[in-house]
């Protein structure tokens, strides 16, 4: 079985796909990742083969991303998905994914839900396709109905010679796999029957990370705002606010800022704060007493799976949805407004001293442990292929 997995660059996009890629590899399937060239470092670190397609023209996305940090959440999501993902990125990706399919001849195409070119290429070539959800499925489906996103996708279909699909019937009919828990979904929104949820079984390592604080028993606070925020006008302000919040607290704080930034850009930090570009989150979560984050779906899912209570400061995209659900689940605190050291400090203090928050996170962790392991998804993919061949 040959499986082409398509993705955008960035940990928030690639990360939720990797459990499925590794599960397929363990089952001796041939797997090829098709992603922008800028994803090469992350893909190769996973020892997965990469078909690199062209990044969008330099600077084409910069103005939009710079503006996103200044937009209210209800506008930032459709702007990113419609203007960037469904127009700029998908237009750049389509030729490369098409070339990968023609040269490598996969049996099936699997695409994360914000990588729109992969399913369109599969449709054009008559290949079966599967989506891998990286955001809340109900809320994501609702966003797809925004005028900005609908227009972008219909323009894309017309550009590549595909029939119109104004109601997204083809997209909704695709099987959808995910490691995101149902607890993150808005209970007021119906879930498609095609959704199948699994639990990730992380390969946790131990390394120099813990040598930084040998003998220090103070609780560990993990601070991360994802891989996109460092590329926007939110850097360095939001990071500095979080660092200032914990500097005088009796905690250890690990801050990650992404591979595109230098820790020196944040200026001096107190001795209880460690700033790194990148640390595998699976290595951090088992030791974290609390987390301060942006509310990215991957980060929130990993934190909940480990039972880590969190303070969520949503910045853009799907993050306000996740902040709201974390608070509703009793697994953390949703922060609103501009980044404020005092507000972050108060939230962290509550997470560390009020057991109810850890209890809420652990309840979700128990629900996630009851899901089938991600290796079970291999059987789903094989059954889909058999159904296609039998049709």
Model-assigned labels for residue ranges:
Residues 192-193, 197-290:
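Donor-nucleotide binding loops and adjacent catalytic segments primarily
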Residues 343-391:
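C-terminal amphipathic helix plus adjacent low-complexity
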Residues 157-193:
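A short, active-site helix/loop in glycosyltransferases that binds the activated sugar's phosphate group
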Residues 1-51:
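N-terminal subdomain of nucleotide-sugar transferases
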Residues 276-325:
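A donor-sugar binding/catalytic signature common to diverse glycosyltransferases
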Residues 49-104:
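Phosphate/nucleotide-donor binding subsite
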Residues 82-160, 164:
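Conserved nucleotide-sugar donor-interacting segment of glycosyltransferase catalytic cores
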């Amino acid at each position: 079985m040959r499986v082409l997995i398509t993705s955008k660059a960035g940990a928030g996009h690639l990360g939720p796909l990797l459990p499925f890629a590794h599960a397929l590899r363990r089952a001796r399937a041939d797997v090829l990742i098709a992603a922008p060239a800028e994803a090469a470092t992350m893909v190769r670190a996973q020892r997965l083969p990469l078909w690199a397609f062209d990044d969008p023209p330099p600077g084409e996305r910069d103005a939009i991303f710079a503006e996103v940090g200044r937009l209210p959440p209800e506008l930032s999501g459709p702007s990113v998905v419609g203007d960037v993902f469904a127009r700029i990125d998908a237009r750049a990706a389509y030729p490369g994914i098409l070339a990968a399919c023609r040269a490598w001849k996969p049996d099936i195409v699997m695409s994360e839900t914000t990588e729109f070119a992969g399913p369109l290429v599969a449709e054009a070539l008559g290949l079966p396709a599967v989506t891998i959800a990286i955001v809340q499925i109900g809320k994501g489906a609702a966003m797809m109905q925004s005028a900005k996103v609908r227009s972008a996708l219909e323009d894309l279909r017309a550009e590549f010679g595909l029939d119109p699909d104004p109601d997204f019937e083809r997209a909704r009919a695709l099987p959808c796999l995910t490691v995101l828990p149902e607890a993150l979904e808005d209970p007021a929104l119906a879930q498609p029957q095609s959704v199948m949820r699994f639990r990730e079984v992380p390969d946790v390592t131990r390394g120099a990370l813990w040598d930084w604080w040998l003998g220090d028993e103070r609780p560990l606070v993990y601070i991360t705002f994802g891989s996109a925020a460092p590329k926007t006008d939110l850097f360095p302000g939001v990071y500095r606010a979080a660092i200032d919040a914990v500097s005088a607290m009796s905690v250890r704080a690990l801050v990650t800022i992404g591979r595109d930034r230098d820790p020196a850009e944040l200026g001096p930090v107190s001795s209880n704060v460690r700033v790194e570009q990148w640390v595998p989150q699976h290595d951090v979560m088992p030791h974290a007493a609390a987390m301060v984050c942006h509310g990215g779906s991957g980060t929130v899912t990993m934190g909940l799976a480990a039972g880590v209570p969190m303070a969520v400061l949503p910045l853009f995209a799907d993050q306000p949805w996740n902040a709201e659900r974390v608070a509703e689940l009793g697994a953390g605190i949703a922060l609103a407004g501009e980044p404020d050291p005092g507000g972050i400090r108060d939230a962290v203090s509550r997470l560390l001293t009020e057991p109810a928050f850890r209890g809420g996170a652990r309840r979700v962790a128990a629900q996630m442990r009851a899901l089938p392991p991600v290796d079970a998804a291999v059987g789903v993919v094989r059954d889909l292929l058999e159904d296609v061949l039998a049709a």
